[in-house]
Amino acid sequence: LFHREVILQEIWLAWQDLDEFSLWSILAKSLAYWTTLLAAGSALNLLWLRETAPHTISLLRWFGPTCAVFAILLNSALIPLQASYLIGEWSAIQDPMMLQFAWESPLGDSLLLRGVGLLLILVAIRPKKLRLGISTLGCGLVALSFAFQGHTLSEPRWLLVALITVHLLGLMFWIGGFTPLAWLAKRQDNSTGLAARQFGKISI
């Protein structure tokens, strides 16, 4: 109990030390990452659900691309937020030099690759075989984009890149599977049990 109180106190103190730029960055990144994972996860789950539970196609063909659009917008906002965070002023949003500095950082490389991946996911709105292949490639690029920033920049870089990419693909699949499975369960569809078992097998 004592340790829990100490941890909570440390969290509260750390929260109080955050400035407004950090708070907005945390909020924007949380929303950007969540919509990104939902978009990619929906596209990945569409690959197997179209055979196991065809009823989910009508849901995922709109849900995934819609999340992708929001993800593109939210990820785009990270560049001006990063520029403002660096100098501690909102005026950096209109400063071409600071925006360029933020764009040329590892964050910019990551967002560029992620944006391309999200654009490819948009083709899942018409889930034909070729388009599903393209959207799957987009999911791979999205997962890879997270390896272009943060601790994966250290050595052994390519091993870390491979590990984080595989980890993100698994996370995308898990997150993207919850919405269609919940939708099937709510409708009490006959394919719910089969879909849940198939989801579990693929996840393992």
List PLM regions with ranges.
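Polytopic transmembrane helical bundles with strong interfacial aromatic enrichment
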Residues: 1-204
